[in-house]
Amino acid sequence: MTALVTAPTADAVTVANRLRPVLLKLNRHLRREIHSLGVTGGQASLLFTIQRRPGIGVRELAELERMSAPGMSKYVGRLEEAGLIVREPSEEDRRRIGLRVSPEGERVLRSVKSRRTAWLAARLRGLTEDELAAVDTAIEPLQELIDE
């Protein structure tokens, strides 16, 4: 009787150990790509969050980013001083102040997206058709993992 030989199945811990450093390095490269725009990766991340949630308050932003409210206030103050965000009274509750990305902040975010996309696309062009298809196939399940 011949034993059926199958390819070993990757377990979650093995995949996580291989994927984690790749994602960290990719994130580091994408953050470096915007250095010349005068914003840090963390500032760009906050701007994108505020852009997705116009009118978000400092406390809500701090909770979302898992930071203290006083710490977030400092980051928000720097973004405001740089002219990248504005504080506006809420339309529902005038006592509440919300954050919005300013026109200059929108310009910076367009540049951030453009540079990061160009950098990543240049590297993806170096893959074979099958490798590119494999990366494309992996995007949806990875997105589901982080959306949970």
Predicted features by range, described:
Residues M1-G41, P141:
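N-terminal leader segment of winged-helix/HTH proteins
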Residues R28-P70, A82-L84:
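N-terminal helix-turn-helix DNA-binding core of bacterial DNA-binding proteins
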